[in-house]
């Protein structure tokens, strides 16, 4: 930290280091994203042992293409952040300019800056959504969805690209209150009411069991099944082979 402080005219570094007595700053890295410089600080703080009372003891969440996140209580989040009109306009402008010219280089820099803006927007929304999910439940159960493979097996590559599915999954996996079920659990097919297995096509949005006549939204059904499978196996011997506790 002191090395970067001496090398750069950082405003407010002294005030930052004195902000809290329980913060121990260890390292600082100077990062350049092609437009701006940032200082990334690594620090340690005392663990917060406060016990928070949350709305739900446990929820299951299903990640999907149609709805980004579906919770077992019926709450849905549909988030898509695509290319901005400003970016599209800049790309059209670039096509009409001579490659390597001053104007071309200026437009390229503006495009890079707009891409960074979109990335920051996606990160901000993902952080807020994950914080919201963690604040409403003591335990979150999700499945190890292979999001990248959805690009090859569906016609929704653009929608997946504009979503924040990967960011949500990655950020949730850092929490010790998130349980990740193996991808092979039949959360969509299985009827926890009677044990029947029913295969659904991607465009089938309702799960209706032909045996017990249970009828439920497909994604809510899958999210509830995640809780069901977790509760069935969490105390069994050999659970570590089928259940990933992050």
Task: Name each model feature, range by range.
Residues 34-246:
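Positively charged, helix-rich recognition surfaces that bind polyanionic ligands
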Residues 1-31, 162:
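Acidic carboxylate diad motif detector
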